[in-house]
């Protein structure tokens, strides 16, 4: 596909997580910051639909009517929220280390607790708490530069954005209806890191089942942030598709 490709970042980082992918995908890439992260202004209501609306506004300003829309983790949730409200503008999906299912009650409680902690204590603790779940064991053992980059990305975010995102993700709906509604016609690439400690392989398989034109790629040696951990391999998977 030669369409522009929108890649939406994971939590709790910003669009710089895609910098290593840019040399391979080049000018096709559009990587906006989601509300409150990086240079993006915040929104008040904790709703990923508002993040999707912000992405659509960004595409409008660029004069782009249709694009491949993708994202990693939280970015994948926003991509599916965008597909829900504007399916005609999505020519393909790239879903990376993400899932279409809603949170469990336990996961929601954990998100609300993290939001409250970020608001009361800042986010100086966040990198230490999340590092071993965000990065795969191979990265933790053999790619110290990725850990340094991730710590810098997390430290650069605002506590209010962290709190907003956690509450917004807690409130997101199940998106399998959206995938099934678009699936017969929509090409999709589903990518997961083989060492992802947060989202199991079964979630990728469930999304693939809802998207008949999907391709599933598992990247060895990567965890939950595969595009940051092994950007060349991720870019190659995108370039080979569909």
What are these regions, as identified by a protein language model?
Residues 10-13, 73:
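Active-site glycine-rich loops that stabilize anionic/oxyanionic intermediates
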Residues 16-23, 28-70, 81-86, 236:
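Active-site loop/oxyanion-hole signature of alpha/beta-hydrolase fold enzymes
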Residues 80-85, 89-129, 133-134:
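Flexible "cap/lid" loop of the alpha/beta hydrolase fold
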Residues 103-107, 121-182:
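Conserved alpha/beta-hydrolase catalytic His-Asp/Glu region
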Residues 3-10:
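Short beta-strand element of the alpha/beta-hydrolase
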Residues 69-71, 96, 191:
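Short beta-strand immediately N-terminal to the catalytic nucleophile in serine-hydrolase-like folds
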Residues 219-235:
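Catalytic histidine-centered segment of alpha/beta-hydrolase-like enzymes
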Residues 156-209, 218-220:
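Conserved serine/cysteine hydrolase catalytic core
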């Amino acid at each position: 596909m030669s369409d522009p490709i929108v890649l939406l970042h994971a939590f709790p980082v910003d669009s710089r997580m895609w910098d290593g992918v840019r040399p391979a995908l080049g000018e096709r890439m559009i990587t906006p910051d989601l509300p409150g992260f990086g240079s993006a202004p915040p929104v008040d209501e904790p709703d990923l639909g508002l993040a999707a609306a912000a992405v659509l506004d960004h595409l409008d300003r660029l004069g782009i009517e249709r694009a491949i829309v993708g994202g990693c983790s939280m970015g994948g949730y926003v991509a599916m929220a965008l597909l829900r409200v504007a399916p005609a503008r999505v020519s393909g999906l790239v879903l990376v280390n993400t899932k279409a299912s809603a949170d469990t009650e336990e996961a929601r409680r954990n998100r609300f607790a993290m939001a409250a902690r970020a608001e009361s204590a800042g986010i100086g603790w966040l990198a230490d708490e999340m590092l071993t779940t965000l990065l795969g064991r191979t990265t933790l053992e053999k790619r110290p530069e990725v850990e340094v980059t991730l710590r810098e990305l997390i430290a650069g975010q605002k506590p209010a954005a962290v709190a907003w995102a956690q509450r917004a993700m807690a409130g997101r709906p199940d998106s399998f209806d959206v995938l099934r509604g678009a699936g017969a016609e929509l090409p999709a690439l589903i990518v997961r890191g083989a060492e992802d400690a947060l989202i199991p392989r079964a979630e990728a398989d469930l999304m693939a089942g809802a998207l008949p034109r999907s391709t599933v790629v598992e990247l060895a040696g990567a965890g939950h942030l595969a595009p940051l951990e092994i950007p060349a391999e991720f870019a190659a998977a995108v370039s080979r598709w569909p």
